[in-house]
Structure formats: structure tokens, C-alpha cells
From Swiss-Prot:
Keyword RNA-binding (UniProt): no
Protein name (database record): Glycoprotein endo-alpha-1,2-mannosidase
Positions of the UniProt region annotated as Catalytic: 60-462
Record-linked PANTHER family: ENDO-ALPHA-1,2-MANNOSIDASE, GLYCOPROTEIN ENDO-ALPHA-1,2-MANNOSIDASE
EC number: 3.2.1.130
Gene3D superfamilies assigned to the protein according to its UniProt record, in alphabetical order: Glycosidases
UniProtKB keywords: Golgi apparatus, Hydrolase, Membrane, Signal-anchor, Transmembrane, Transmembrane helix
Compartment(s) of residence: Golgi apparatus membrane
Native organism: Mus musculus (Mouse)
Superkingdom assignment: Eukaryota
Length: 462
């Protein structure tokens, strides 16, 4: 009997040793960070839902997305409150990727909700009618009704948020920092102006500048086509921006090859103003000229049609950008024309700034515009555009957009959401951070390649 007990103890000990060895072996084979755990330091961002490391199979993605969707939906019930991110710890910038100040992203601060603004703004965007009544009658009309029905084909991870919410602004800055975006190009209207579906937003600029500075981001201005925009009020508005915000450490200035540090202004829909009017502002002899004054800058025109090239030269602009995320929509947004545009810019001493987007879909507000939809193809469309931009050796690259949700060009985090009437698009089978991660990847590639051909490698002036 004693001999049997001894044998049993030996066998049991060997079995325990085998199990222990097996567990240790598996532990060594399993990576410290699973394939789909938070990469690139994104675990530093305030997350709405904790992300557990898992094997990354399709079932895991679907299960995780269901949890995200359910949590998001619950948080949005009752007055559509902004989904507040978890309180962040002190920012450790050393753990975040380096910034690329030659990569800009168009940023919109026009969103609002009842919690912060007393009503929904922009999320309840009206459905726009086609200009031809014969076509318009075939499509729905009316207005979106947040929080479950918003004017977008995607749904934000932060819900129908307010651009006034400081925690939302901070989360946006963290996301851009995680993507190695160095500069946000802020959509801007003068203090007494607004877009057709929004409210005045200039009062938000100080908070945006402060939050950007916390992450070493810079802010430049994307001047919208406000009512009656001309040389005189543009001069006044440029003076206003520089006088009010120009001394902030987050205010962006570009160091030119001649050593000057100048503010930069993207001018949206510049082509609707006659070249002779722009020349009054942008040429040295103009009646409203800012040249060689404290209000001089780099003024970047939107090139839509090929014929705009000569208008831009006559106007006195310093460069061009293409804005639209739909390849083939305009001459300027068509990748196949970018090499020619770059040659034109080099010949005429202009900056060339191609604009790249992750996709395009605006059918939530323009249901008749399906011909301009561009599928994201799980990030491939975005990467093709970024590759085409890099091949031109551009001065800068602009991203359309960080958060233009109406046109489906956002790289901001989006989550799955389903309602009784709508199934929103999302980034599956990838994570909500897919386009931030792709942006970081190409930002690093652009930074390295730019060093091989550009002379202006300085950091932006503070």
C-alpha cells in the first residue's frame, strides 16, 4: 500500500510539473501586447470602452463591436448627452509619437448638443434638395433627429458631441497627436458669422489653442466663404486673427526658405472671388495689401478646375490645396493630375498641398450624390491617396478630414451603431482607431521622405 501511495505521489508531482511547464511555455509564446491591443501608445487615450487583448479573429471583433455599440447607445439615451471620455492622467508626451508639422488635418468645431449648447447643432443637418426639381422629388426631405438619427453615414465614438465640450476637444487633440498630425486647420468664420446650419464658433478658438498646445500641436486657419467675403473684410479678419491669436504658442507659422516665419491661411472656395479682388489683398501694390506688413502670411487657394491655375497666379496666392476627398470629382482632387499641379507650382514658386481623404459618402445629407461616394476599402483608398501625394514630393500634405462627419471623410474614431431605421457604417473588421493608425504610419513615411528633397526642415515658429 505504501509503495502504491509513493507511486501515486510521484505521478501526481510529474503531472503538476508538466502542467506548470506547459503554462510557462504558452506564456512565453504569447506576446506582451496582443495583435489587436492598443498600438502606437493609443492606450494613453481616454477610451469609452476598455480594450482587452485578444486573438483578433472575426468573432472577437464582432463581439467587441457589439459591446461598443451597446455601451454607446445606452450612454446616448435621454437628451443625447455627449459620451464623456474617462478622466485622463497627466500627459506623458514622451510616450506619444513625434509630430509631423508638415501634415495638416482639416478640423470642424461646429457641432453642438443640448447638454452644452441647449440644442443640437449640425448633427440635425437638413437633407439638401437637388437643384433640379425633377430629381429632387425622388428623394426624402426633412431634417435629421439626433441622437440616434444624425447627418452622417458613420457614428462617432463620442456620440453626438458638442465642440464646446472641453473634454471632447482634448480627446480630439490626443487622437491627432496619436496620429502624428502636427497641425489642425480650423474651419473659421468671423465672430459675427456662421455657416448655414450652425452657430458662431470663433469664441471656441482660445480653448482649441490651449488644448492643442498641451499636446504640442499647432493651429492654422481654414477661412470659410462667409457672406460678402472680399479684400477689405479679409484684411480686417486676417488682422483680427493675428492680433488676437498670433502670440499664442499654438499659433502656426511656417518657416520659409528665406527664413521668414509666416502664418498660413487656407482659403476655401477662393475661386468664387474675382482674381482682381484677391490681388488687392495679396499683391504688393494692392490697395488692401498685407504684403511686407505685420499681417503678411502664406495664403493657400483651393484649386478645383484646371482653369483656376491662371486665376491663382493673377490673385497673388502663395500656394494651392485640393481639399476634396473624392478622387476624380474635380481636376484638383484627381490623383492623376497631381504631378502636373506640382510642376506648375514649382515653375511659379507656389506651395503644392494635395489633400487626401479616407473615403467619401455624403448621402445622409445629399441622397442624390451617390456617384461621388468612394468606399474606404478597409483603409486601402486612404493609403492609395497618401501614396499618390507622397510621389509628388509636396510641400505639405493635408487630410480631409479629421471630423467632417457629414461627408464621411473623418478619420476620427467611429463605432458600429444600428437603429430601427439606420445601420451606420463603421471601420470593421478593424478597430475605431484604424485611420488614426494609418495616418501615423504614413506621417512617419512622409517625414522621412521629405528630408530627402526639402530644404525647409525647421520646426514651426512658436
Amino acid at each position: 500500500m505504501a509503495k502504491f501511495r509513493r507511486r501515486t505521489c510521484i505521478l501526481l508531482s510529474l503531472f503538476i510539473l508538466f502542467i506548470f511547464s506547459l503554462m510557462m511555455g504558452l506564456k512565453m509564446l504569447w506576446p506582451n501586447a496582443a495583435s489587436f491591443g492598443p498600438p502606437f501608445g493609443l492606450d494613453l487615450l481616454p477610451e469609452l470602452h476598455p480594450l482587452n487583448a485578444h486573438s483578433g479573429n472575426k468573432a472577437d471583433f464582432q463581439r467587441s463591436d457589439r459591446i461598443n455599440m451597446e455601451t454607446n447607445t445606452k450612454a446616448l439615451k435621454g437628451a443625447g448627452m455627449t459620451v464623456l471620455p474617462a478622466k485622463a492622467s497627466e500627459v506623458n508626451l514622451e510616450e506619444l509619437p513625434p509630430l509631423n508639422y508638415f501634415l495638416h488635418a482639416f478640423y470642424y468645431s461646429w457641432y453642438g448638443n443640448p447638454q452644452f449648447d441647449g440644442k443640437y447643432i449640425h448633427w440635425n443637418h437638413p437633407v439638401l434638395e437637388h437643384w433640379d426639381p425633377r430629381i429632387a422629388k425622388n428623394y426624402p426631405q426633412g431634417q435629421h433627429s439626433p441622437p440616434d438619427d444624425i447627418g452622417s453615414s458613420f457614428y462617432p465614438e463620442l456620440g453626438s458631441y458638442s465642440s464646446r465640450d472641453p473634454s471632447v476637444i482634448e480627446t480630439h487633440m490626443k487622437q491627432m497627436r496619436s496620429a502624428s498630425i502636427g497641425v489642425l486647420a480650423l474651419s473659421w468664420y468671423p465672430p459675427d458669422s456662421r455657416d448655414d446650419n450652425g452657430e458662431a464658433t470663433d469664441h471656441l478658438v482660445p480653448t482649441i489653442l490651449d488644448k492643442a498646445h498641451k499636446y504640442n500641436l499647432k493651429v492654422t486657419f481654414h477661412i470659410e466663404p462667409y457672406s460678402n467675403r472680399d479684400d477689405q473684410n479679409m484684411h480686417q479678419n486676417i488682422k483680427y486673427i493675428i492680433d488676437k491669436y498670433g502670440n499664442h504658442p499654438a499659433f502656426y507659422r511656417y518657416k520659409t526658405r528665406t527664413g521668414h516665419s509666416l502664418p498660413m491661411f487656407y482659403v476655401y472656395d477662393s475661386y468664387i472671388t474675382k482674381p482682381t479682388i484677391w490681388a488687392n489683398l495679396l499683391t504688393p501694390s494692392g490697395s488692401q495689401s498685407v504684403r511686407s506688413s505685420p499681417y503678411d502670411g502664406l495664403f493657400i487657394a483651393l484649386l478645383v478646375e484646371e482653369k483656376h491655375k491662371n486665376d491663382i497666379l493673377q490673385s497673388g496666392f502663395d500656394g494651392i490645396y485640393t481639399y476634396f476627398a473624392t478622387n476624380g470629382f474635380t481636376y484638383g482632387s484627381s490623383h492623376q493630375n497631381w504631378n502636373n499641379l506640382k510642376s506648375f507650382c514649382e515653375k511659379n514658386n507656389l506651395m503644392f498641398i494635395p489633400s487626401v481623404g479616407p473615403g467619401y459618402i455624403d448621402t445622409s445629407i445629399r441622397p442624390w450624390n451617390t456617384q461621388n461616394t468612394r468606399n474606404r476599402v478597409n483603409g486601402k483608398y486612404y493609403e492609395v491617396g497618401l501614396s499618390a501625394a507622397l510621389q509628388t514630393h509636396p510641400s505639405l500634405i493635408s487630410i480631409t478630414s479629421f471630423n467632417e462627419w457629414h461627408e464621411g471623410t473623418q478619420i476620427e474614431k467611429a463605432v458600429p451603431k444600428r437603429t430601427a431605421n439606420t445601420i451606420y457604417l463603421d471601420y470593421r473588421p478593424h478597430k475605431p482607431s484604424l485611420y488614426l493608425e494609418l495616418t501615423r504610419k504614413w506621417s512617419e513615411k512622409f517625414s522621412k521622405e521629405r528630408m530627402t528633397y526639402a530644404l525647409d526642415q525647421q520646426q514651426p515658429a512658436s
